[in-house]
Amino acid sequence: MQVDIIGDIHGCFREFAALTETLGYHWDEGVPIHPDGRKLGFVGDLTDRGPESLNMIEIVCALVERNLAYYVPGNHCNKLYRFFLGRNVQIAHGLETTVAEYRTLPPSEQEMIRRKFIRLYEQAPLYAVLDEGRLVIAHAGIRHDYIGRTDKKVKTFVLYGDITGEMNQDGTPVRRDWAKRYHGSAWVVYGHTPVEKPRFVGRTVNIDTGCVFGGALTALRYPEMETVSVPSSMPFVPEKFRTFS
């Protein structure tokens, strides 16, 4: 199995296009296709904050429908899904940018995007177990003893990380560094928490290098376990990046 797993995109379509081209994908058919049959993987959080969230929805839906990509949802995907279902969600923390894009469309196009994303989300696994169990893609990561489970506790972990219930001063949840306690044999590739460079800890890799906050968009090439990044065009916001001791 050969897959290029891409970190949190958050509507940064230009960087996504540049990264896929750097990885050797061709866009002749309107979506990135690799001549050697490699597939793309997405750790979720396709939308919000960046300028082209709807473009990302269209591209990923097309790739998944053609069996050219693996997609798992992130917490921002979960919130957008609930918005599209008509649930009462707070249109903030980035969702407002996607909703603003969405509301510029005529009603027929709004309905098409809404249906596409709902189908993408509902058909996606909570996390993807690939290569006969040797690789797991999970938005915020997953504990080794949670692999194989999909109960509420596991869903919270996969979407939000190992949260304590406490809050930081900036309003973000306090999270434990679960990767240091991961003892599974599978590689876990995840994002969710922006770091300035890809973070390898044991058999875990955080590839969210904060593209929407001015960092970079990163892919992990599997099974090579090499990272490839392209710089962000967004302003750099240093306080959005987490450092680990």
From Swiss-Prot:
One of its GO terms (molecular function) is nickel cation binding. InterPro entries: Ap4A_hydrolase (IPR050126), Bis(5'-nucleosyl)-tetraP_PrpE (IPR023937), Calcineurin-like_PHP_ApaH (IPR004843), Metallo-depent_PP-like (IPR029052), MPP_PrpE-like (IPR041780). Its cofactor is Ni(2+). It catalyses: P(1),P(4)-bis(5'-guanosyl) tetraphosphate + H2O = GMP + GTP + 2 H(+). Its EC number is 3.6.1.17. Pfam families: Metallophos. GO terms for cellular component: cytoplasm. CDD domains: MPP_Prp_like. Keywords: GTP-binding, Hydrolase, Nickel, Nucleotide-binding. Asymmetrically hydrolyzes Ap4p to yield AMP and ATP. Belongs to the PrpE family. NCBIfam families: PRK13625.1. PANTHER family: BIS(5'-NUCLEOSYL)-TETRAPHOSPHATASE PRPE [ASYMMETRICAL], METALLOPHOSPHOESTERASE. This is Bis(5'-nucleosyl)-tetraphosphatase PrpE [asymmetrical]. It comes from Geobacillus kaustophilus (strain HTA426). The gene is prpE.
